[in-house]
Amino acid sequence: MSDNAHNLLYDKFELPEAVKMLPVEGLPIDKHARFIAEPLERGMGHTLGNALRRALLIGLEAPAIISFAMTGVLHEYMAIEGVIEDVTNIILNLKGALLKKYPMQDSSLGRTTQVLKASISIDASDLAAANGQKEVTLQDLLQEGDFEAVNPDQVIFTVTQPIQLEVVLRIAFGRGYTPSERIVLEDKGVYEIVLDAAFSPVTLVNYFVEDTRVGQDTDFDRLVLIVETDGRVTPKEALAFSTQILTKHFSIFENMDEKKIVFEEAISIEKENKDDILHKLILGINEIELSVRSTNCLSNANIETIGELVIMPEPRLLQFRNFGKKSLCEIKNKLKEMKLELGMDLTQFGVGLDNVKEKMKWYAEKIRAKNIKG
């Protein structure tokens, strides 16, 4: 017996062909985007939306400043001569630093914590050129290393007199948000001040689920996911990374049973000649081999042709009087033999639930006339 004989055969799941990315009105798409996935089976919108939201908010890594030291700074509650901001405000400004750098697998640095030193030297001419107040920005502090600042013009402190000092930054990689009391530095300097670290590049994730349709069946989900980032990653990158994180975690549950599930594929009209499909759709119900019970059920529901049958969603068929799961199973198997299925989208033939009976008659007459002429 082949390995495939042990596989379980499941009915197909409706899945989107692709995820659409759209801008959020009035906002730049490199930081704000809307993603739409449809159709999804009922309930899968919330299942995927909630999982992706959590992974986006807590799973993505980015660098952040976790500590700093500065010449003459003994603690965070002091003022510095010749500097407008006190140390508390300098800390707040450092927390607003948005750093980019992704450790590559083949990089010698990897994910190690890095210490960057910057020498700041401001003389009278610098002050004169700046009207007496020289701003020191984030870019001025990134003299070493290969970190890129998304907001390089972020002001860290402002100098009002000639000064020479050294600023030391310790930068680490992490996820989410880590308060300073949870950051442990083994080689912490005596006057090194540890900061709260906001690692996550994702600032906001919202999602909602709407109804959508497949053919005439509206019992499907449309997932709308709104992602906002701080610019260190794009929303598209963030969604791709979070999906990989979830896939990694789901994989640990995959091999709990030797049996595998094989999903049936949806019927695609494009794969078959349209004329062949039409010849099947105009067939009368009495022209295919169904049990008397199933035939009578369809007749009582005023379903006369295969076209009228296949356009019906499965739940709607079950609403007809005396139509049970046994008849449903028989009909689905018969349609499968014909390479058809319930709930088919016949819009490319101009056929909907509101006109299917008339359209089937029109197509039958058209094909009959063509055969006579031929």
Swiss-Prot record:
**Keyword annotations for this protein?**
DNA-directed RNA polymerase, Nucleotidyltransferase, Transcription, Transferase
InterPro entries given in the database record: DNA-dir_RNA_pol_insert, DNA-dir_RNA_pol_RpoA/D/Rpb3, DNA-dir_RpoA, RBP11-like, RNAP_asu_C, RNApol_insert_sf
Source species, domain of life: Bacteria
Catalyzed reactions: RNA(n) + a ribonucleoside 5'-triphosphate = RNA(n+1) + diphosphate
Consequence of mutating residue 372 to T? In strain: CWL029 and TW-183
| Renumbered residue ranges of the record's region Alpha C-terminal domain (alpha-CTD) | 274-374
User: Is Glycosyltransferase included in the keywords of this UniProt record?
Assistant: no
Q: Name one Pfam family in it.
A: RNA_pol_A_bac
Any one GO cellular component localisation term in the record: DNA-directed RNA polymerase complex
Q: Where is this region: Alpha N-terminal domain (alpha-NTD)?
A: 1-257
* An example Gene Ontology molecular-function term: protein dimerization activity
* Enzyme Commission code: 2.7.7.6
Q: What class of enzyme is it?
A: transferase
Q: Name one GO biological process term.
A: DNA-templated transcription
Q: What is known of its domains?
A: The N-terminal domain is essential for RNAP assembly and basal transcription, whereas the C-terminal domain is involved in interaction with transcriptional regulators and with upstream promoter elements.
* Annotated NCBIfam families: PRK05182.1-2, PRK05182.2-3, PRK05182.2-5, rpoA
Q: What family is this protein classified in?
A: Belongs to the RNA polymerase alpha chain family.
Oligomeric state and partners? Homodimer. The RNAP catalytic core consists of 2 alpha, 1 beta, 1 beta' and 1 omega subunit. When a sigma factor is associated with the core the holoenzyme is formed, which can initiate transcription.
Q: What does this protein do?
A: DNA-dependent RNA polymerase catalyzes the transcription of DNA into RNA using the four ribonucleoside triphosphates as substrates.
For this entry, the protein name equals DNA-directed RNA polymerase subunit alpha
- Species for this entry: Chlamydia pneumoniae (Chlamydophila pneumoniae)
Name of the gene encoding the protein in the UniProt record = rpoA
